[in-house]
């Protein structure tokens, strides 16, 4: 059907149409090839912003380092990282003065966190740089490998299971003269196949020991691996993001815990809250500025943009902030928190995979690894790449680039927000000591600034003063990209404010549709997304009804499960028609079995199986929800599952949906091609790790999950738990005497085997 698009906007206020200008339909752009070029860009830019700083050499690694702190005063308009320590400290002092006790209280909260956090906190997160294999791995595997290497090198504090003890091992590892690691490699052999008598290549996976001297180990411990950020909309160029190794992660976690605790107490901070809570917080600040700007005052708002926030931040500034925030705290606590910024001041950026070359004439392709960039003849490269490599060469060591200034994306979001808020805090009249004053909102690098003054000159003066104050702490407001409006209309973190926040519905568009997990989860996620958008994003009833119909249509096409009485022919239609004809109560069939859709906007909160249960034929119920059915996944399904949905900005977010285990909740198997590569050993480790954890969870269901205290191993904990549970079950008559005896016998056998081992 052809719709004249202008008709859609006849009754819509202009600000609500903002959503249609966002680049959020269709697939987002992904990067291909290596991120080496983007990483070199980042390293070179970061050094350029700080180029008038002082050069020094790291005595341990020999890496050249640039320190712009307390260097020349920053210049107007040019982004720079020349923060002044005394200015940062003063901003911190004023922040504390206007929020008495804020640092003290946050330190106490964080001390508790430090003492209670378990090392498994580090298993959260996806890809992590694994220094033992010098490449990325899932976080849990990278942690397991690190701990394994630590143990084989005599570092065992981590066995207590506390994160702080693992960090003690990290500190000790840096003092060791050498570290021995195990690496995976693969051998290829040509052998004759007995069956076919042909020559085939046989691959075997080996593990070999390798010694790293102190310098090599330090370089690896301080390395951030880099990748290209994928799926970034509305940008022409890709950019690099970093993933740190396990040595850095734990320290960063504690610093961010402290900063998060501070942010929670600051009304101008857009972190760590999100969604509606964030909107309410922001609306409060705006309301305050508007009510306080009496009829005599003007109020203007800047929708702010900072130039290269991360690349102008400096870990040395963060160290100064932490030193100030923790100044009255115990020595051990101050030390733990100061390590992350110190490590970041000495960080190395891994350049990624290197460059791919192809020769059209000779039909050759070859990879130039990053390690070779320091020595290779530059005549093979085009001009722009040649310039990049020339610039970065003095910084290269073993395929990594020394990167002392700058912060890499997303590492200290909370702490950098504290810095931003401290400048917003200086806008109070008691600090500006003049007729203009300001307030605003800060969320990582995004900000909105509200300036009040009696006249336009005052507004201009206020903006100028804010701009210059920011410069002194290494924040560069972009004059080109920021714009100013009468207060009441602005944008902050993709929320659009026009006398209240307007729903920016296009942000949610990518999460509509079929997720592709399995038939059961997809149906549940699809209707939950529609329900959530009715609650949070002004999705009206008529549009929601239409979204629902489109979703069902999309779902049927994805899983080829058109209604049993349809004319559409697909690979499944023969089976589905047969089921349709055999079924007495056709309304009871799930949509994925060719049944009708019973959802409307009033019952989106009910899982489909529950919605149709009373309508189902008995034998259909039996097949659908029979735990002995081989097609039912035997994973115990929690009543609530988490799906990852892709909103348009920010990281993928986790969304809860109701899960009912049926024959449709299958879990696809892993791709087999990985099993023939050097990854195989790693994969087996990972599966074993997974199995142990799953088994452990069986013994300690989350409701009663108190970790075994003391030094007991996982096995001991499970055995003692099994005995307790068995006794309770036996005494309450849930199990027979024979079963009880058998359980006790198994427990004793396990203990006996452990003793023999």
From Swiss-Prot:
A motif (Nuclear localization signal) lies at residues 187-195, 203-216. Its EC number is 2.7.7.48. RNA-dependent RNA polymerase which is responsible for replication and transcription of virus RNA segments. The transcription of viral mRNAs occurs by a unique mechanism called cap-snatching. 5' methylated caps of cellular mRNAs are cleaved after 10-13 nucleotides by PA. In turn, these short capped RNAs are used as primers by PB1 for transcription of viral mRNAs. During virus replication, PB1 initiates RNA synthesis and copy vRNA into complementary RNA (cRNA) which in turn serves as a template for the production of more vRNAs. It catalyses: RNA(n) + a ribonucleoside 5'-triphosphate = RNA(n+1) + diphosphate. PROSITE patterns: RDRP_SSRNA_NEG_SEG. Disulfide bonds: none annotated. This is RNA-directed RNA polymerase catalytic subunit. Phosphorylated by host PRKCA. The keyword Transcription regulation does not apply. Residues 249-256 are annotated as: Promoter-binding site.
